[in-house]
């Protein structure tokens, strides 16, 4: 410690010395008077101090209470009660009084012993090193986390699982078809094994850089999107060791209480859809529990003035918002309109009608709104309940809304007539205003923008060929044949978009403008990111027609993916399908394992594997069983009754 410096003499007040000869007698008399005065002052101060000290002494009863407070609380002292017959006489006396005093003494001894034990434990803690204390704290934290996991993973009330048909099988009799199916399985194994090695736990994989990849739709957290998305594909293909690896990761690591902003739409179709499908296929309770946990985290997104959910929600805070690029802060039709299948199953499995009410509210609101030319615009403001920009598309921003109207009807065992009517009305408007034929005879689905038709079709819109075929049965005015043919025409157009490229892989979108047909013009539209929609349409049309061309076209696509997208670390998209020397984008999308490879595998499987009269595939290709109940009331669900 530094010694403080002495104050300089010039800074002190020192009275000057009088060095002249004193007048001695006068000086003594003055001193005597001063001494008496000082003594009197001291005496007065002493008396005042004593009196004040006596006056301000603490109340002895309060001091006693403070000193014995613990004993007063823990040891009931025996006093004469106010209501006693003889005041001043103890109520407890004789042997009872003696026994009470013994108990009181034992209690005092116990308090002293506990106090000494606590002191010893405190001393022991102080003697431990900082590392030991940290280790103990971490152990306690781990214990609390484990207890929370046990509580979170508590089984939900049992609900009868629908009759599940065709979760195994599909072995083709033809050797050539069997070999092709095995090749698709090997491609799945290559994609999964490399993700397992280089991207495990991350949402997706960068197969060239050989590291994890997390797009912003899943937020900043490692939620294992590829694991959840691929589970049912692994199960269907009989890759059970890989399935168990994924299941263990989900049990130990999948946590939704993270400070991460995610897309409500994407986590619904990929995570909730994937977990529900894995539950129905395997019967493992953990998948149902995790699906419900995530669904609860999505519910705050519906806290808007209209009940139309936000596009994004923070899983921890529940704060929602919409995409900055969306028209006037709007929600997207294909996003808030693609929740029905998963939410109906959540209500079925939990008995909680909240999920059912959320999606039915969206449906009722849409039914009341005016629709220009009978078409649903892609943008709806969740604050005002008004349409945004008048842009209608069966491709991106609109696609799966129409798909889920049809599939809501199918999933209800064709009893949700309201959904079927909405689908039929929408398809009639689409056919009237959006579906056109090119000069070369190709049927395409354009986009309606601000009163005019843009003659451009996106890869995402190619799913519609399968949708038209799937919805043919039950269509109005006995038009089943018409819609099956319309689906086939869309499939042919999308196949042409593949066949007119150098890689035999389709671009992201393609135009029909003059001499240009089914070809991408802009560089940003020439990429292929392992999308499934064309192969999805091939599979549906194969199931309904058994026309061999769909297997042939599917195999062409599989060979092109194998040749141009396969790399040592997995599969990657390509940036230009018109270049014979493509550049890879270095992303293995989770939907490649969930959809593209699953549809290829089913294309070369028998119809008894996941038959369409028992299963409905969500927009991420996760199969959910048909519920044989009226989904407008869920009256057939014992959990609800």
UniProtKB/Swiss-Prot annotation:
Q: Which GO terms describe its biological process?
A: carbohydrate metabolic process; ERAD pathway; Golgi apparatus mannose trimming; lung alveolus development; N-glycan processing; protein glycosylation; respiratory gaseous exchange by respiratory system
Q: Which residues form a coiled coil?
A: none
Q: Which UniProt keywords apply?
A: Acetylation, Calcium, Disulfide bond, Glycoprotein, Glycosidase, Golgi apparatus, Hydrolase, Membrane, Metal-binding, Signal-anchor, Transmembrane, Transmembrane helix
Membrane topology classification: Single-pass type II membrane protein
Instruction: Say yes or no: keyword Signal present.
Output: no
Chief subcellular location: Golgi
One of the Pfam families matching this protein, by short name: Glyco_hydro_47
Provide the membrane-side ranges marked Cytoplasmic in the record: 2-36
Kindly list the positions at which N-acetylthreonine occurs in this protein: 2
Reported EC number(s) for this entry are: 3.2.1.113
| Protein name as catalogued | Mannosyl-oligosaccharide 1,2-alpha-mannosidase IB
Origin species, per record, is Homo sapiens (Human)
Name of the coding gene: MAN1A2
């Amino acid at each position: 410690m530094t010694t403080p410096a002495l104050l300089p003499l010039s800074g002190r007040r020192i009275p000057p010395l009088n060095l002249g000869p004193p007048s001695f007698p006068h000086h003594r008399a003055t001193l005597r008077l001063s001494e008496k005065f000082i003594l009197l002052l001291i005496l007065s101060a002493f008396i005042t101090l004593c009196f004040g000290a006596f006056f301000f002494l603490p109340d002895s009863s309060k001091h006693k209470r403070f000193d014995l407070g613990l004993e007063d609380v823990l040891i009931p002292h025996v006093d004469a009660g106010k209501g006693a017959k003889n005041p001043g006489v103890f109520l407890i006396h004789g042997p009872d009084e003696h026994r009470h005093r013994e108990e009181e003494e034992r209690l005092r001894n116990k308090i002293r012993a506990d106090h000494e034990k606590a002191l010893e434990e405190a001393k022991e803690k102080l003697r431990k090193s900082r590392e030991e204390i940290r280790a103990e704290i971490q152990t306690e934290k781990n214990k609390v986390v484990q207890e929370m996991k046990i509580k979170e993973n508590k089984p939900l009330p049992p609900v009868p699982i629908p009759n599940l048909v065709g979760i195994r099988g599909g072995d083709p009799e033809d050797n050539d078809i069997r070999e092709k199916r095995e090749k698709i399985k090997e491609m799945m194994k290559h994609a999964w094994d490399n993700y397992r090695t280089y991207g495990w736990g991350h949402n997706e994989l960068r197969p060239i850089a050989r590291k994890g990849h997390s797009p912003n739709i899943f937020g900043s957290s490692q939620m294992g999107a590829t694991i959840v998305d691929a589970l049912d594909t692994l199960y269907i293909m009989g890759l059970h060791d890989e399935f168990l690896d994924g299941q263990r990761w989900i049990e130990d690591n999948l946590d939704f209480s993270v400070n991460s902003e995610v897309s409500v739409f994407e986590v619904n179709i990929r995570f909730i859809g994937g977990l529900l499908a894995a539950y129905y296929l395997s019967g493992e309770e953990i998948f149902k529990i995790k699906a419900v946990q995530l669904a609860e985290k999505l519910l705050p997104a519906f806290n808007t003035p209209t009940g139309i959910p936000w596009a994004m929600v923070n899983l921890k805070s529940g704060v929602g918002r919409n995409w900055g690029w969306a028209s006037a802060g709007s929600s997207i039709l294909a996003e808030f309109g693609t929740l029905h299948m998963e939410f109906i199953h959540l209500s079925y499995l939990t008995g909680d009608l909240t999920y059912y009410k959320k999606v039915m509210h969206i449906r009722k609101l849409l039914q009341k709104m005016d629709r220009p030319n009978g078409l649903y615009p892609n943008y709806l403001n969740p604050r005002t309940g008004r349409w945004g920009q008048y842009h209608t598309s069966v491709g991106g921003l609109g696609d799966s809304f129409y798909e889920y109207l049809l599939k809501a009807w199918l999933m209800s065992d064709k009893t949700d007539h309201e959904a079927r009517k909405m689908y039929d009305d929408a398809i009639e408007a689409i056919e009237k205003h959006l579906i056109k034929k090119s000069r070369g005879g190709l049927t395409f689905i354009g986009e309606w923008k601000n009163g005019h038709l843009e003659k451009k079709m996106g890869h995402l819109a190619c799913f519609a060929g399968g949708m038209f075929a799937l919805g043919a049965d039950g269509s109005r005015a006995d038009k089943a044949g018409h819609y099956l043919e319309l689906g086939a025409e869309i499939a042919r157009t999308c196949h042409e978009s593949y066949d007119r490229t150098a890689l035999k892989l389709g671009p992201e979108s393609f135009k029909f403008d003059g001499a240009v047909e089914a070809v991408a013009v802009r560089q940003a539209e020439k990429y292929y990111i392992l999308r499934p929609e064309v192969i999805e349409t091939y599979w549906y049309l194969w199931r309904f027609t058994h026309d061999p061309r769909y297997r042939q076209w599917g195999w062409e696509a599989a060979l092109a993916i194998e040749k141009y997208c396969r790399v040592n670390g997995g599969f990657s998209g390509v940036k230009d399908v018109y270049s014979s020397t493509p550049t890879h984008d270095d992303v293995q999308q989770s939907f490649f394992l969930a959809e593209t490879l699953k549809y290829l595998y089913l294309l070369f499987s028998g119809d008894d594997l996941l038959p369409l009269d028992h299963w409905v595939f969500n927009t991420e290709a996760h199969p959910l069983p048909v519920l044989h109940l009226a989904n407008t009331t869920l009256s057939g669900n014992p959990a609800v009754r």
